[in-house]
Amino acid sequence: MITLAALQMKSESGDVAANLARIGQAAKEAAGKGASLLITPELGLTGYGAGDVIRDLAEPADGPLVRRLQAISAETGVAIIAGFAEKAGADTFNSAVYVDGPAEPVVYRKSHLYGDYERTLFTTAEPSTMLFTHRGVKCGMLICYDVEFPENVRRLALADVDAVLVPTALPAGYSGTFIADHMIQTRAFENQVFVAYINHCGGDERFTFAGSSRIAAPDGSLLASAPSHGEALMVVPLNPADFLVSKSENTYLTDLTRRA
């Protein structure tokens, strides 16, 4: 079992220092509430709508920004998932990093870029299964649009993860409302995993965000939800053992791979 903190955040566009400070503040608050892992939104460190400046702010996965996240994690005792622009040679990836103090970071690169805005800024990564175990709970990461493809969540479920953790930048509108209110719980139920889907709130010079962050359980129930407006820090326990009955009743993964 772990206690997860999830920050629905108003990022400052192009202001990495301010966003890093906000994440540090949230990590301290999460520690005070007994959480051991904090998840934050897609590109939360640069701001999602910062445009071309995002490429200028990109850093390698072993750069000073990730090292600062590691320091915050070590200071607070809280592991952190943060979205950043990752520089790798000539490529810039839309990435999320998991840091747990001085341990080796785990980096996931977004494999399904959404729209011309993202495709202009970032290189498309190959679909990948980047896993880590946090305090005994096996986790995988996706980013925003990735979770809208059931194949991506199913791939992680077949790798036996307990939780799928999804930094996102979901725009406001009908589609955003549908995704938050229906798709996230469905992804959790059909794969019998926790799904944490953590969004921005407010807006920037290009986008208005839906807020509406969600944490869903393997039985499809909603463990926590954030409002459509304003920041929120949700703190919830994730205990796979609480949902063994659901897994025994809903044997999708077993039956999918069953041989006649």
Please place each PLM-identified region on the residue numbering.
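Extreme N-terminal starter segment of soluble prokaryotic enzymes
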Residues: 1-6
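Active-site catalytic loop in hydrolytic enzyme cores
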Residues: 61, 87-159, 172-182, 239, ...
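Cys-nucleophile CN-hydrolase/nitrilase-fold catalytic domain and related Cys-dependent amidase chemistry
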Residues: 16, 24-107, 171-186, 190-193
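Short, acidic/polar
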Residues: 18-27, 147-154
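CN hydrolase (nitrilase-like) catalytic-core segments centered on the catalytic cysteine
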Residues: 64-79, 148-232
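Short polar catalytic/cofactor-binding loops
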Residues: 8-13
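Short beta-strand scaffold segments in enzyme catalytic cores
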Residues: 82-84, 95-98, 130, 197, ...
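Structural motif
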Residues: 36-37, 139, 163
